[in-house]
Structure formats: structure tokens, C-alpha cells
Swiss-Prot record:
GO biological process: 3'-UTR-mediated mRNA destabilization; cellular response to cytokine stimulus; miRNA metabolic process; mRNA processing; mRNA transport; negative regulation of low-density lipoprotein particle clearance; negative regulation of nitric oxide biosynthetic process; positive regulation of mRNA catabolic process
Record's GO cellular component terms: cytoplasm; cytosol; membrane; nucleoplasm; nucleus
Positions of modified residues (Phosphoserine): S99, S125, S129, S131, S181, S184, S193, S274, S480
Organism the protein comes from: Homo sapiens (Human)
Keyword Lyase in record: no
Organismal lineage: Eukaryota, Metazoa, Chordata, Craniata, Vertebrata
InterPro entries: FUBP_C, KH-I_FUBP2_rpt1, KH-I_FUBP2_rpt2, KH-I_FUBP2_rpt3, KH-I_FUBP2_rpt4, KH_dom, KH_dom_type_1, KH_dom_type_1_sf
Protein name (record): Far upstream element-binding protein 2
């Protein structure tokens, strides 16, 4: 009994395991003593008793830890398991929480239900359990970064794309947020903000480089060095002196636009509003190295020209606009300046080193403006070439009309004193009235297109046809022979038929033949008298007149009579007689009518001969006219005109000898033979136009043969 009283209460029945454990703990509470004392008090083995030996006795050393120490060790083990599960990121934490530990009592849930721990420790344990279960659902956030990237300012639109589709694609494919700065601030590059994971930012940069490289025409992936400090794209700044920034910019920015277009670079004049106007301003030039250098030289040329005092002034060639020169060119001479297939204007541009463009207009004015762009000295050189070319067109070969050349002032009718306009300055053609609309077009668009395409000037004449036929209208084409031929071809394509020449021949004025002015033959412009190339009076006979006053000598005759035409076809001689009687019934005025081969005064000792076919003798009238012309005062500054009076007298004498058959033995009423004269005329026509009449071409029309050919 003393043993029980000393070591603790007597052992209870076996079922209460908890009580036995507590007794054992009480017996082993004091520090372990000598082995004898321990045996006597039953602290280690005896304290366990039959109730607690299976749970606590064997797991603890004699006299060692109780239930509090075991619970702390279990909590530490659970905490370590949770940390391992969190690192693995799997379901290990859940497995650890639901598993039963290898201890002698219940699992974790059983532990929390024990009432031996304070309330705060229970709540902390529950929170740790919930966090371990929610950990796999919310993984830890990845590291994010923001980087500033730069792209060319001109490529921003390409990067954004239509409706922002390109920049959206970059963000979706790379997983990076892309934000572009709204303004470059006058710099050649725009800032782009890239936000995301490092690998996403790197991928977005590669995609931006590819887009910019494709925009510049290079292979993808080669822009990074260019846009961010590379050497393939050059940026150079030159200082513009104070007060000369306006020269570089030009009116409305025209000069700097032309410089950028010609050099193929981008120019930005940096102007700070806070700076003083007397401070030099930097001009930033961006582009390829060679183009940048060329642009710098062009800018310096403009500044140097101003220093020399010549920039912006007007000279004899036209007005300077934005570093260029405007040169007026007569509309009918535009084709000559351009040349066939543009050969002439290309040659001028290559020789002078400039660029020439004709400004668009409505096509109604007498001149077109050729705008020359380039350095000032080269522009002047090109303008000088164009003016020399126009001057050569205005001047014709000198010489009396009886010579082999054309009269001075060009073929046909010229303007003013006959020395204006290129050779072959004007031709008149008849077109059926119902086809005039095809030539003119709606609102005049067709005739304007012909004028612009050929360089000729086509207009409808206000004069009536020579025979007053209302079924035809007269059209006038002015320009060089090449321009006239080109315009004729286009008009013939529109009316689907040939044009009928009307009026004076290429060398002198003369109405159409008696078979009608609308015969579709190429050489029916004049009467079969003297050769047309020498039949007209000298060029200075024409007073100044406008384009509209083309045929002032014509009077509207009676309407066309078919019966008279049939009679004329039956008797050609009678038709020619009627033709001359109608044509020469008008009194000679200030603008004399055409002169057929009038009979010369009879030689000394011979009786006067009547003119053949009823023609009048106008020799004296012509002599008197030329005397009056010679007495008229010349305009100041005009070159002295030669006196062709004697030449014309000699010419008409020779024509009179030809008209009388070559000698006094010829019968007075015989028809003259103009075969040789017509042959010479056609030869000169072929030489002028660069064509050679073939075997079936026009033949000299002597008397009857000429009339049959005209039919």
C-alpha cells in the first residue's frame, strides 16, 4: 500500500486509457532521479500502468516528455509538409492534410478538436490549411517589366495598321502591352512603351523591327540598328542662319517639299517658339547617307544664292518660285519642246541637270507654263535652252519668195508680222457638221485632250466655208508640222474619216479649186497657177491679226448649186474661168487676195496681149502695193526688212512668160503648162515633210490631168 501511496493512485481498470497516461505523467514529472527512486515511485514503467502503456509509455524515455511535447512536434511536422507542398505546387498539401500521421492518436482534424490548445492557435492552424488548399488555384504572379523602345516617326501608321489591327496583332502574339507616344516632339523617332514579361517584350521588339524593315523595303529583322542608333539610316543637322529659315521652307512649305521630293529624304526644321528669332535654327535631314549629302548641298545652294542677291528675283526667263523658274511656252510649240516620245525634254533635263514639268491648265490659253526645278544656275541654263529653241521656231529662212525656200515667217499664215509660230503654223480643215460634236466633246473635253496630247492648238473657226455650205464647219489647227499631223490623226480617228484641207496652201494663200473646197485630196488647196510655195506674197504683207481673223478676204457667196457643180465637172476650163471671176471680183484691200500668175507687161515693141482665160493683170497693183509697204515706217527695234519689189517684178515676168507658153509663138488663148511648177512644189513638200511621193502619189496636174486628179 505504501508503494501505491508514494507513486500515485492505484491502477484503474484497463479501458480508461487516458487516465493511465495521466498517472504515468505524474509519476514521471520530477527530474529523473536515481534508478532506485524511479522504481520505487513508478515514474517510468510503473506510471504507465496498464492503461497508458500502449500509447505513451513505450514512445517516451523514462521520466521524459508528456502530451504537450508530442503535439508541438506534430505541428512542426505538419508545417514542414505544407511548405514542401507549396514549393511543389501540387496537391501534396491536400494529401498531407488528409493523411493520418504515424502517431498514436488521431489525425490533424482530431488534433484541432482537442481542447488543450488555446483558441488563437486553432484559428491559425485552420488558416494555414485553407491557404494550402487555395495555393494551386492562384499561382504566384510572374515578374513584369516596362521598356521604352523607339521607332521611326514615319512608320507609326504602319505599326498601328488599319483600324489598329496591326498593333492588336502584336499585343496578342507577343503577350506584351504596346503603347505609342502620341507625338514625336519634332524628333525623327517616336517612343513606344512595351510592358510585360521579359520574353514578351523581346518578342514585341522583334515584331516591330520586322514591320519597320518591310516598310523600308529591306529584309525583315534589319531595322533595329537603323532605328536605335545604327549606321544604315543617317541623321544630319545643318544650321540655318537667322532670318533665312523662310527660304528653306518657302511659300506654304513649297520649297522644302520640293527639296524632299528631289533628294528623297525627310527634312525637319526645328523651331522653338521660346527662342529668339535671331537664333540659328537646326535643319534635320534623315535618309540614306548619299541622299542626305545631296540634300545638304541643295540647301546650301539656296542659301548661297540668297547671299549673292539673286534668289527670289525675276529675270528674263520667268519668275522663280521655290527655287525654280517658270518659262511661258506657246501652246503650239509645246510639242516641239517635249519632242517625239519626250526625247527633246529629256535631253534638256539631262544637259542642264534639272527637272521640267508643264503645269496643267484648262487648255484655253495661248501659252503653257514650263516649270523648271533645280539649282538656280542650272534652271537658268535650261530656260536659256528652251528660249533658244522657241526663237529658232519663230524665225524662218530668209530670202525672196522666188527662191527655193519657204517665205520668211513659216508656212501658211503666221501671227503678227508673219514671223511668229513654227513652220507650218496653221492648217484649216472642213468637217461635216454632224461630226463636230465628236471632235469637240462634252464641255470641250475632246478638243482639250487633243491639244494637251499633241501640243497643237485646235479650234473651230467662226468663218463660213468658202462655198457657204452649212453642212460643213471649218477647224483650224496651229502648231509645228509634226503637231498638226498628230492632231489630224486623232481627229480622223474620232470622225472615222479623212480631213479635207481648206484654204491656203502650205506656202502661200489660195482658195480651193473649182471642183469644191472639200475634195479629200492632200494637195487641192490652191489654184493650178504658180507653184504654191512661191505663189504667196512675202511674209511682211500681213498686218497684225488675231487667230480668229483667219480668212478676212472671203465674202459669203451664194449657196452651193449642184447644177453648176455638174457643169463645172463637164467643162474644167469653164469652171476655172468661173472660179477666177468669182475670186477676183473683190477689189484689192489692205490685205490683198492671192495672186495667181498674172500676165506681165508686154515686152518692148510688141502689142499688148490679152490675159488668157479672162484673167486680169495685177502686176501694177502689186508693184504699187509693195511701194506703199516699203514707205511704211518700221516699228522701233524691229529688224530692217528687205525690199522684194524688184524680186517680185522679175518673178511675175517669168510667170508671164510661162503663162504665154514660153515664147511669142504660142497662141494667146492656150492653157499654160504648170507641170514643172507643180513638180517643184511637190518636191519641196516631200523634202519638208520628210516623205517621198511614191509612184501612186500626187502628180503634177497639167491642164486636164490636174482637174481629173482633183476629182
Amino acid at each position: 500500500m505504501s508503494d501505491y501511496s508514494t507513486g500515485g493512485p492505484p491502477p484503474g481498470p484497463p479501458p480508461p486509457a487516458g487516465g493511465g497516461g495521466g498517472a504515468g505523467g505524474a509519476g514521471g514529472g520530477p527530474p529523473p532521479g536515481p534508478p532506485g527512486a524511479g522504481d520505487r515511485g513508478g515514474g517510468g514503467p510503473g506510471g504507465g500502468g496498464p492503461g497508458g502503456g500502449s500509447a505513451g509509455g513505450p514512445s517516451q524515455p523514462p521520466g521524459g516528455g508528456g502530451p504537450g511535447i508530442r503535439k508541438d512536434a506534430f505541428a512542426d511536422a505538419v508545417q514542414r509538409a505544407r511548405q514542401i507542398a507549396a514549393k511543389i505546387g501540387g496537391d501534396a498539401a491536400t494529401t498531407v492534410n488528409n493523411s493520418t500521421p504515424d502517431f498514436g492518436f488521431g489525425g490533424q482534424k482530431r488534433q484541432l478538436e482537442d481542447g488543450d490548445q488555446p483558441e488563437s492557435k486553432k484559428l491559425a492552424s485552420q488558416g494555414d490549411s485553407i491557404s494550402s488548399q487555395l495555393g494551386p488555384i492562384h499561382p504566384p504572379p510572374r515578374t513584369s517589366m516596362t521598356e521604352e523602345y523607339r521607332v521611326p516617326d514615319g512608320m507609326v501608321g504602319l505599326i498601328i495598321g488599319r483600324g489598329g489591327e496591326q498593333i492588336n496583332k502584336i499585343q496578342q502574339d507577343s503577350g506584351c502591352k504596346v503603347q505609342i507616344s502620341p507625338d514625336s516632339g519634332g524628333l525623327p523617332e517616336r517612343s513606344v512603351s512595351l510592358t510585360g514579361a521579359p520574353e514578351s517584350v523581346q518578342k514585341a521588339k522583334m515584331m516591330l523591327d520586322d514591320i519597320v524593315s518591310r516598310g523600308r523595303g529591306g529584309p525583315p529583322g534589319q531595322f533595329h540598328d537603323n532605328a536605335n542608333g545604327g549606321q544604315n539610316g543617317t541623321v544630319q543637322e545643318i544650321m540655318i542662319p537667322a532670318g533665312k529659315a523662310g527660304l528653306v521652307i518657302g511659300k506654304g512649305g513649297e520649297t522644302i517639299k520640293q527639296l524632299q521630293e528631289r533628294a528623297g529624304v525627310k527634312m525637319i526644321l526645328i523651331q522653338d517658339g521660346s527662342q529668339n528669332t535671331n537664333v540659328d535654327k537646326p535643319l534635320r535631314i534623315i535618309g540614306d547617307p548619299y541622299k542626305v549629302q545631296q540634300a545638304c548641298e541643295m540647301v546650301m545652294d539656296i542659301l548661297r544664292e540668297r547671299d549673292q542677291g539673286g534668289f527670289g528675283d525675276r529675270n528674263e526667263y520667268g519668275s522663280r518660285i521655290g527655287g525654280g523658274i517658270d518659262v511661258p511656252v506657246p501652246r503650239h510649240s509645246v510639242g516641239v519642246v517635249i519632242g517625239r516620245s519626250g526625247e527633246m525634254i529629256k535631253k534638256i533635263q539631262n544637259d542642264a541637270g534639272v527637272r521640267i514639268q508643264f503645269k496643267q491648265d484648262d487648255g484655253t490659253g495661248p501659252e503653257k507654263i514650263a516649270h523648271i526645278m533645280g539649282p538656280p544656275d542650272r534652271c537658268e541654263h535650261a530656260a536659256r535652252i528652251i528660249n533658244d529653241l522657241l526663237q529658232s521656231l519663230r524665225s524662218g529662212p530668209p530670202g525672196p519668195p522666188g527662191g527655193p525656200g519657204m517665205p520668211p515667217g513659216g508656212r501658211g499664215r503666221g501671227r503678227g508680222q508673219g514671223n511668229w509660230g513654227p513652220p507650218g503654223g496653221e492648217m484649216t480643215f472642213s468637217i461635216p457638221t454632224h461630226k463636230c460634236g465628236l471632235v469637240i466633246g462634252r464641255g470641250g473635253e475632246n478638243v482639250k485632250a487633243i491639244n494637251q496630247q499633241t501640243g497643237a492648238f485646235v479650234e473651230i473657226s467662226r468663218q463660213l466655208p468658202p462655198n457657204g455650205d452649212p453642212n460643213f464647219k471649218l477647224f483650224i489647227i496651229r502648231g509645228s508640222p509634226q503637231q498638226i499631223d498628230h492632231a489630224k490623226q486623232l481627229i480622223e480617228e474620232k470622225i472615222e474619216g479623212p480631213l479635207c484641207p481648206v484654204g491656203p496652201g502650205p506656202g502661200g494663200p489660195g482658195p480651193a479649186g473649182p471642183m469644191g473646197p472639200f475634195n479629200p485630196g492632200p494637195f487641192n488647196q490652191g489654184p493650178p497657177g504658180a507653184p504654191p510655195h512661191a505663189g504667196g506674197p512675202p511674209p511682211h504683207q500681213y498686218p497684225p491679226q488675231g487667230w480668229g481673223n483667219t480668212y478676212p478676204q472671203w465674202q459669203p457667196p451664194a449657196p452651193h448649186d449642184p447644177s453648176k457643180a455638174a457643169a463645172a465637172a463637164a467643162d474644167p476650163n469653164a469652171a476655172w474661168a468661173a472660179y477666177y471671176s468669182h475670186y477676183y471680183q473683190q477689189p484689192p484691200g489692205p490685205v490683198p487676195g492671192p495672186a495667181p500668175a498674172p500676165a506681165a507687161p508686154p515686152a518692148q515693141g510688141e502689142p499688148p496681149q490679152p490675159p488668157p482665160t479672162g484673167q486680169s493683170d495685177y502686176t501694177k497693183a502689186w508693184e504699187e502695193y509693195y511701194k506703199k509697204i516699203g514707205q511704211q515706217p518700221q516699228q522701233p527695234g524691229a529688224p530692217p526688212q528687205q525690199d522684194y519689189t524688184k524680186a517680185w517684178e522679175e518673178y511675175y515676168k517669168k510667170q508671164a512668160q510661162v503663162a504665154t507658153g514660153g515664147g511669142p509663138g504660142a497662141p494667146p488663148g492656150s492653157q499654160p503648162d504648170y507641170s514643172a511648177a507643180w513638180a517643184e512644189y511637190y518636191r519641196q513638200q516631200a523634202a519638208y515633210y520628210g516623205q517621198t511621193p511614191g509612184p501612186g502619189g500626187p502628180q503634177p496636174p497639167p491642164t486636164q490631168q490636174g482637174q481629173q486628179q482633183a476629182q
